[in-house]
């Protein structure tokens, strides 16, 4: 088994990945929002768990003539914990870097919205998601903790010091794919 395959299984350690009706409905709606925005959308098997993958690439001169490869990676769980979201974020980042990250930094950037969708979200998971983006060289992750029952999607929606040229774009896409509850 490859290291990546092992990591896929490890990410689910201590997690109940049952897709309850509200979780499945939220994931389906997220897939529809991704398609409506022009993303390529598919479902992949990650160690026995169906994971929603959305992808789009955008080029802007105002980004210093760079192309941003944006992935949305969303998976079901019953309880979103900070530890689970951190593991999932690391796995999602490795996944996108393996697909589009080889030439990053040379007029290419990679971003990912790793989202765990559950029927319960621990306050620590919401706080971690809202606390800031996770960075690697020319790559950024903005984790999302979703409570499928209330529709609340906790994520960093601010303006970071690093990667600021993409901030408005990432915030716009985050709001489109994971709208703030009540909007």
Segments from the language model and where they lie:
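Nucleic-acid nuclease catalytic cores
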Residues: 103-128
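"Short basic amphipathic alpha-helical interaction patches in structured regions
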Residues: 85-88, 126-133
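Switch/connector loops and helix/strand junctions flanking conserved nucleotide-binding motifs
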Residues: 82, 122-127, 153-155
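Arginine/glycine-rich "motif VI" loop of SF2 helicases in the C-terminal RecA-like domain
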Residues: 101-108, 133-138
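N-terminal, charge-rich interaction modules
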Residues: 2-79
């Amino acid at each position: 088994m490859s290291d990546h395959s092992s990591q896929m299984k490890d990410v689910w350690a201590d997690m109940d990945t049952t897709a309850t009706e509200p979780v499945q409905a939220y994931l389906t709606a997220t897939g529809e929002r991704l398609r409506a925005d022009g993303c390529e959308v598919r479902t992949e098997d990650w160690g026995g768990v169906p994971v929603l993958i959305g992808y789009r690439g955008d080029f802007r001169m105002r980004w210093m003539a760079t192309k941003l490869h944006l992935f949305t990676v969303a998976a079901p769980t019953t309880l979103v914990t900070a530890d689970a979201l951190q593991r999932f974020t690391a796995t999602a980042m490795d996944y996108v870097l393996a697909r589009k990250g080889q030439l990053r930094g040379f007029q290419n950037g990679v971003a990912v919205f790793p989202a765990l969708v559950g029927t319960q979200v621990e306050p620590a998971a919401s706080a971690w998601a809202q606390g800031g983006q996770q960075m690697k060289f020319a790559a950024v992750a903005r984790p999302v903790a979703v409570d499928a029952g209330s529709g609340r999607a906790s994520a960093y929606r601010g303006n970071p010091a690093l990667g600021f040229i993409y901030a408005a774009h990432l915030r716009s896409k985050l709001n489109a794919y994971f709208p703030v509850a009540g909007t």
